[in-house]
């Protein structure tokens, strides 16, 4: 039989909640909602397998609930603590105390069949971790045990054995100490100590300690300590400590600490700490901390912290923190934080934060934050934030933010934001935003935005936006927008828009739009639009539109439209439309339309349409249509159509048709059709159609269509279509389409499409599309697309796309894409992409991508990517990537990556990575990585890594790493590492390490380590270490170590060690050690030791005070013994150097 279930023991709080807040059932299934199969305590249910193991996770509280649950063995995961297991789900089979749970598990261990289930179809296999399993009486439980247990070991077997039968208390021997004076009543359980004055009443549980004055009443659970003065009443659960002066009343749950002055009342749940002065009343839930001076009243939920000065009142929900000075009153919901100085009154909902100076009043809903100086009053709904300096008064609805200077008053509805300087008054409805400097007064309805300078007054209805400079006065209805500079006065109805310069006066009805320069006066009825430059006076009825230049005077009835240049005078009845150039005079009845260029004089009846060129005079009745050229005089009645030839004056009303010959001047209202001959000037209103021969001048309103011959000039409003012949000039508004032949000049508004022939000049607004022929000049706004043939000049705004032919010059804003032909010059802003053929010059901003052909020059900002053809010159900022063919010159900032072909010159900042072909010249800052081909010259700063082909020259700073192939020359600073191929020359500073191939020459500072191939020549300073192959030459200073192969020449200073192979020559100074192979020659000075192979010559150079003399010895058959170290003794005899304690042998 296979056991597939086990029993697990755990504890919960008295309410059946575990440490994670999960409420366990009294019986039935319990499951973790966030199960994770890991060997950690979180994300699962845990307990002691079969009730044996560490006691660290069992509750020590007397009212803890001991739970036994049944768990499938396959679900169990062992944890690191002895006996602890983790599982996703369980079946609760028993709930009781420690003894009953222990008896339950012990009984089931004796009868394992009660917790196992047999199956005839399959056998359940436990998880890979070892799970102890209960066995019959002959089996024992095996638990993982730590080497050193950090907690007591709990075992249900020992508990059951020591306990009485189930449902009985353990047997203990009563040990009580009771001391009382007369008139007292004492009752204590086991191990209790009761001491009381006369007339007292004390009742204690196990292990309690009660001390009371006369007339006191004390009741405590087991393990408690109570001390009180006379006439006090103390009641506490087990494990509590209570201390009270006379006349106090303390009540607390288990594990609490209460300290009270005289005549105080303390009530707290379990685990609380209360400290109070005399005449205080403290009430708190479990786990709370309360501290109060005398005369204070504190009430808080569980887990709260309250600190109060003298005569203060604090009320807070659970988990709150309250701190107050004397004479303060604080009230807060759960989870709140309140801090107040003396004399303050704070009231807040749950989760709020309140900080107040002295004598302040704060009231806020839940989740609010309030901060105030002294003598301030703040009131806010839930979720609000209020900050005020001293002497301020703030009132706001829920979710609002208020910030005020000294002595300010802010009132706002919910969700509002208010910011003000000192001495300001702000009032706003809900969802509003107000910002004001000192001395300002703002009043706005809900959803409004108000911004004011110093000493300004703003009044607006709901949903309005007001912005003003200092000393301004703005008044607007709801949904209005007003913007004014200093010293201005604006008054508008609801839904209006007003913009004014300094010292201006604007008055408008609701739904109006007013824009003026400085020192202007605008008056309009509701629904009007007025635009004026400085020094103008505009007056209109409701629903009117007026536009005026500087120093103009416009007067119109309601529903009128007036447009005038500077120094113009316009008078019209209601519903009229007037458009005039500067210094014009227009007079019309109601419902009329007048259009005139500068210097014209127009008079028309109501419902008429008059269109005139400059210097013309038109008079027409109502409903007329007039069209005339400049310097013409056209007069027409209502509903008329006028057509004039060159140099004519035509005046027509709306919807008219005018036809004029060459050199004519035609003016027409909206929707007109005009046809003129050679050298004509045509002017038309919105939606007009104009056709003219060569050298004509055409002006059209929005949505017009214009067609002109050779050398024409066309001007059109928004959405116009213009077609012109050779050498034409076209001007169009937004969304226009223009088509012109060669040598044309085109100007368009936003979203326009322009097509021009050879040598054309095009200018366009945002989002335009321009196409031009050879040698064209194109200028476009943001998001434009330009296409031009060779030798074109293109200028575009942000996000533009430019395509140009051979030898073109392109300039673009941010994020542009430019493509140009051969020998082009491209300039672009940040994030641009440029593509050009050979011999191009490209300049880009940060983060740009540039691609150029042969022999190009590229300049880019930070983080750019550049790719260029043969013989290119590239310059880039930090973090750039450059790629060029051989023969190129590259310059890059810090952290750049440059790749170039043969014969290139690369210069980079710190931390750069340079890669180049043969015959290249590379220069880099500190920490750079350089890789070059044959015959390259590399120069780098400190800490650089250089790699080059053969015959290269490398120069590096301190701590550099250089690698070069055959025939290279390397120069490095101190502490460098150099590696070179055959026939290389290396020069390094002190302490350097050099490695070279065959026939290399190495020069290093003192203390260097040199390693070279055969026939190498090594030169180093003092304290050096040199190693070389056969046929090498080594030269070093004092205290050096030299090693070489056969047929080598070694020269060293004093105190050196020289070792070489056969047929070598070794020369050293005093006190040196020389060792060589056969057929070698060794020369040493005083104190030196020489050792050589067969047929070698040993020469000792000695100084006798006047001259040098030599002692010579030869090794071999007729000489001294080979491979023995020899030196010159005090008698100037050559002797072999003995080992310690050996006799020395004189050599004759």
Curated annotation (Swiss-Prot):
Compartmental location: Cell outer membrane
Residue ranges for the region (Disordered) are: 110-131, 222-256, 367-394
Ranges of biased composition (kind: Low complexity): 114-128
Q: How does it sit in the membrane?
A: Peripheral membrane protein
- Keywords for this protein: Cell outer membrane, Ice nucleation, Membrane, Repeat
Provide ranges: composition bias, Polar residues.
230-250
**Is-annotated flag, keyword Repeat?**
yes
Q: Which Pfam families match?
A: Ice_nucleation
Region Octapeptide periodicity: start and end of each range?
180-1099
- What cellular-component terms does GO give this entry? cell outer membrane
A molecular function annotated in GO for this UniProt entry is: ice binding
**How does the entry describe the domains?**
Contains many imperfect repeats of a consensus octapeptide A-G-Y-G-S-T-L-T; further on a 16-residue and a regional 48-residue periodicity is superimposed.
Give the record's family classification: Belongs to the bacterial ice nucleation protein family.
What job does this protein perform?
Ice nucleation proteins enable bacteria to nucleate crystallization in supercooled water.
Please identify the protein, giving its name as recorded: Ice nucleation protein
């Amino acid at each position: 039989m296979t056991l597939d279930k086990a029993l697990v023991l755990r504890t919960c709080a008295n309410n059946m909640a575990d440490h994670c807040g999960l409420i366990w059932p009294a019986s039935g299934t319990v499951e973790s909602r966030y199960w994770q199969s890991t060997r950690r305590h979180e994300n699962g249910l845990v307990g002691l397998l079969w009730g044996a193991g560490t006691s660290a996770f069992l509750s020590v509280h007397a009212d803890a609930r001991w739970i036994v649950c049944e768990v499938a063995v396959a679900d169990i995961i062992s944890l690191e603590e002895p006996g602890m297991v983790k599982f996703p789900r369980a079946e609760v089979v028993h709930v009781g105390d420690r003894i009953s749970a222990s008896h339950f598990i012990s009984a089931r261990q004796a009868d394992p069949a009660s917790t196992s289930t047999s199956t005839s179809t399959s056998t359940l296999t436990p998880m890979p971790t070892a799970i102890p399993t209960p066995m019959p009486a002959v089996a024992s439980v095996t638990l993982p045990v730590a080497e050193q247990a950090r907690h007591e070991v709990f075992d249900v077997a020992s508990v059951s054995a020591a306990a009485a039968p189930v449902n009985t208390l353990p047997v203990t021997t009563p040990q009580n100490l009771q001391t009382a004076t007369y008139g007292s009543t004492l009752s204590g359980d086991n191990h209790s100590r009761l001491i009381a004055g006369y007339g007292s009443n004390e009742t204690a549980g196990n292990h309690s300690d009660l001390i009371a004055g006369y007339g006191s009443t004390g009741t405590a659970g087991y393990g408690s300590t109570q001390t009180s003065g006379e006439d006090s009443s103390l009641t506490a659960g087990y494990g509590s400590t209570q201390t009270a002066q006379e006349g106090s009343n303390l009540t607390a749950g288990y594990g609490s600490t209460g300290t009270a002055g005289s005549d105080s009342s303390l009530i707290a749940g379990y685990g609380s700490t209360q400290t109070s002065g005399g005449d205080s009343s403290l009430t708190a839930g479990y786990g709370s901390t309360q501290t109060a001076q005398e005369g204070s009243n504190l009430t808080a939920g569980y887990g709260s912290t309250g600190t109060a000065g003298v005569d203060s009142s604090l009320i807070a929900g659970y988990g709150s923190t309250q701190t107050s000075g004397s004479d303060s009153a604080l009230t807060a919901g759960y989870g709140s934080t309140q801090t107040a100085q003396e004399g303050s009154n704070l009231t807040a909902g749950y989760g709020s934060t309140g900080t107040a100076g002295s004598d302040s009043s704060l009231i806020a809903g839940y989740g609010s934050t309030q901060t105030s100086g002294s003598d301030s009053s703040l009131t806010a709904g839930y979720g609000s934030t209020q900050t005020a300096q001293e002497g301020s008064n703030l009132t706001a609805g829920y979710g609002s933010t208020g910030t005020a200077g000294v002595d300010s008053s802010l009132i706002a509805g919910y969700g509002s934001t208010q910011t003000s300087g000192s001495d300001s008054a702000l009032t706003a409805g809900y969802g509003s935003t107000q910002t004001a400097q000192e001395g300002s007064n703002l009043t706005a309805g809900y959803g409004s935005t108000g911004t004011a300078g110093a000493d300004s007054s703003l009044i607006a209805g709901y949903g309005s936006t007001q912005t003003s400079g200092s000393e301004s006065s703005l008044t607007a209805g709801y949904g209005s927008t007003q913007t004014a500079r200093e010293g201005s006065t604006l008054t508008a109805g609801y839904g209006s828009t007003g913009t004014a310069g300094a010292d201006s006066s604007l008055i408008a009805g609701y739904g109006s739009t007013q824009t003026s320069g400085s020192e202007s006066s605008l008056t309009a009825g509701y629904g009007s639009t007025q635009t004026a430059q400085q020094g103008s006076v505009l007056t209109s009825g409701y629903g009117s539109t007026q536009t005026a230049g500087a120093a103009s005077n416009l007067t119109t009835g309601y529903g009128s439209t007036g447009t005038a240049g500077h120094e113009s005078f316009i008078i019209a009845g209601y519903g009229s439309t007037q458009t005039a150039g500067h210094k014009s005079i227009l007079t019309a009845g109601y419902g009329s339309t007048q259009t005139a260029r500068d210097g014209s004089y127009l008079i028309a009846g109501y419902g008429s349409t008059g269109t005139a060129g400059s210097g013309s005079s038109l008079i027409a009745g109502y409903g007329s249509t007039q069209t005339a050229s400049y310097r013409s005089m056209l007069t027409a009645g209502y509903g008329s159509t006028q057509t004039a030839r060159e140099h004519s004056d035509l005046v027509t009303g709306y919807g008219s048709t005018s036809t004029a010959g060459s050199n004519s001047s035609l003016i027409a209202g909206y929707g007109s059709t005009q046809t003129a001959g050679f050298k004509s000037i045509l002017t038309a209103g919105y939606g007009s159609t104009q056709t003219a021969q060569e050298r004509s001048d055409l002006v059209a309103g929005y949505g017009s269509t214009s067609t002109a011959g050779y050398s024409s000039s066309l001007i059109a409003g928004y959405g116009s279509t213009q077609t012109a012949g050779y050498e034409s000039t076209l001007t169009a508004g937004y969304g226009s389409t223009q088509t012109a032949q060669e040598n044309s000049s085109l100007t368009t508004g936003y979203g326009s499409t322009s097509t021009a022939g050879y040598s054309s000049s095009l200018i366009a607004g945002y989002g335009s599309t321009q196409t031009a022929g050879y040698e064209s000049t194109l200028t476009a706004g943001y998001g434009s697309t330009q296409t031009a043939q060779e030798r074109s000049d293109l200028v575009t705004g942000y996000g533009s796309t430019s395509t140009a032919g051979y030898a073109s010059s392109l300039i673009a804003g941010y994020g542009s894409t430019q493509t140009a032909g051969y020998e082009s010059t491209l300039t672009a802003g940040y994030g641009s992409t440029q593509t050009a053929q050979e011999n191009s010059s490209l300049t880009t901003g940060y983060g740009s991508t540039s691609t150029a052909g042969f022999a190009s020059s590229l300049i880019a900002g930070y983080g750019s990517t550049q790719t260029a053809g043969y013989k290119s010159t590239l310059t880039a900022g930090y973090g750039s990537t450059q790629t060029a063919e051989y023969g190129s010159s590259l310059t890059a900032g810090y952290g750049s990556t440059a790749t170039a072909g043969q014969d290139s010159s690369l210069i980079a900042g710190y931390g750069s990575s340079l890669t180049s072909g043969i015959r290249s010249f590379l220069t880099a800052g500190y920490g750079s990585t350089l890789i070059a081909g044959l015959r390259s010259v590399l120069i780098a700063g400190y800490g650089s890594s250089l790699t080059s082909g053969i015959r290269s020259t490398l120069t590096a700073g301190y701590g550099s790493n250089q690698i070069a192939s055959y025939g290279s020359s390397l120069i490095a600073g101190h502490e460098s590492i150099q590696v070179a191929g055959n026939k290389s020359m290396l020069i390094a500073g002190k302490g350097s390490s050099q490695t070279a191939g065959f026939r290399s020459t190495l020069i290093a500072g003192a203390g260097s380590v040199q390693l070279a191939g055969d026939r190498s020549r090594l030169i180093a300073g003092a304290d050096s270490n040199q190693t070389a192959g056969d046929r090498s030459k080594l030269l070093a200073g004092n205290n050096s170590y030299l090693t070489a192969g056969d047929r080598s020449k070694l020269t060293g200073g004093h105190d050196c060690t020289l070792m070489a192979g056969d047929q070598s020559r070794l020369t050293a100074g005093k006190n040196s050690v020389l060792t060589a192979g056969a057929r070698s020659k060794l020369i040493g000075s005083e104190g030196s030791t020489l050792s050589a192979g067969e047929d070698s010559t040993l020469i000792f150079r000695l100084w006798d005070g006047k001259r040098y003399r030599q002692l010579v010895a030869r090794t071999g058959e007729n000489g001294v013994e080979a491979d023995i170290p020899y030196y010159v003794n005090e008698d100037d005899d050559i002797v072999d150097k003995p080992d310690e304690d050996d006799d020395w042998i004189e050599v004759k």
